Amino acid sequence: MAISSFKHEHPLEKRQAEAARIREKYPDRIPVIVERAEKSDVPDIDRKKYLVPADLTVGQFVYVVRKRIKLSPEKAIFIFVKNILPPTAAIMSAIYEEHKDEDGFLYMSYSGENTFGIFF
């Protein structure tokens, strides 16, 4: 997976400080960065940074992403964490604890097709 543009645009120390501040201020929320996968045919998302309730499921978060990119109902969308497709019933806090980045953010990418084909 290519380096995310969010990581490219912001130095590690700044990202770490921001994630720590967010987690301290909102302990029941997960800081998530969502970016479109490379070569994906779905629209780009209007904002990349999300503060997600810890008890939200991956499926519920996929719904949020679909709404933000205004994806039509007949089009598929896949959300990946480190090139892996997490189960839709998984709780975001569990995904965060297992896959958070060294900077404290959870990075997710989305695509209109299952480009990686790997499931948890």
UniProtKB/Swiss-Prot annotation:
The keyword Transcription regulation does not apply. One of its GO terms (cellular component) is cytoplasmic vesicle. Keywords: Autophagy, Cytoplasm, Cytoplasmic vesicle, Cytoskeleton, Lipoprotein, Membrane, Microtubule, Protein transport, Transport, Ubl conjugation pathway, Vacuole. Transmembrane segments: none annotated. Constitutively expressed. The C-terminal 3 residues are removed by ATG4 to expose Gly-117 at the C-terminus. This Gly-117 forms then a thioester bond with the 'Cys-558' of ATG7 (E1-like activating enzyme) before being transferred to the 'Cys-258' of ATG3 (the specific E2 conjugating enzyme), in order to be finally amidated with phosphatidylethanolamine. This lipid modification anchors ATG8 to autophagosomes. The keyword Membrane applies. The record marks G117, I118 as: Cleavage. Its main location: membrane. It is found in: Cytoplasmic vesicle, Autophagosome membrane; Vacuole membrane; Cytoplasm, Cytoskeleton. One of its GO terms (biological process) is protein transport. Disulfide bonds: none annotated. A lipid is attached at G117 (Phosphatidylethanolamine amidated glycine). It holds the Pfam family ATG8. Gene3D superfamilies: Phosphatidylinositol 3-kinase Catalytic Subunit, Chain A, domain 1. It is a lipid-anchor. Residues 118-120 form a propeptide. CDD domains: Ubl_ATG8. Interacts with ATG4B. Interacts with NBR1. PANTHER family: MICROTUBULE-ASSOCIATED PROTEINS 1A/1B LIGHT CHAIN 3-RELATED. Ubiquitin-like modifier involved in autophagosomes formation. May mediate the delivery of the autophagosomes to the vacuole via the microtubule cytoskeleton. Belongs to the ATG8 family. This is Autophagy-related protein 8d.
